[in-house]
Amino acid sequence: MNKGELRTHFLALLNRSDCTDALADTFIDQAIGRIRRTLRIPSMEKQQTYSVTSPGGLSKIVLPADFLEAIDTYYDGDALVRLPLHEMLAYQKTGGLGSPRYFTRELGTFYLHPQPTGGTLYLNYYSELEALVADSDINALTVVASDVIIYTALGYASDYFLDERGQLFDGKAAVFLAEVQEQADTAEQSGGTQVMRPTTTYED
């Protein structure tokens, strides 16, 4: 559904003559803001590539403007491990160069250690949802979870209008949200056998 279709369906389900289009849009925006805080689905995933050409070492990278949450970060096929900020600051004082093994986020920046001088760094992340401005606009959420948006918005509308159907709307929104997340989680695990790994390995 696009924004206009979401609004039309929302207003039909709410079935109130005192809810304007502007109010409906506010409830829909509130719903999207709430959903994005918890839902993590493949259609929200993006990849940012950083080509490193810094003879003196690259100490940090700037995160994409639509960055919401990191999935993984890797360099030359090796995943980086996240460290607490105080440990990273201690490492960075050494100024070591080489393939990065660790990262730390501070505001809109990832700090790296060791500091790479070349190669390619990859960041897989969950992105913010595109804003719905025009009635024809869609985003990753409207395509796969329009019912979650609509019923979450109906919950906000019920609070505003003191509508007794609020609990019903919230309950349906929670069920739909769980279904979408479960479908995404199942798809993530499909196609291979899950194997138990030992916590410790020993070499001869």
PLM feature spans:
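Glycine-enriched, solvent-exposed interface loops adjoining structured elements
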Residues: M1-D204
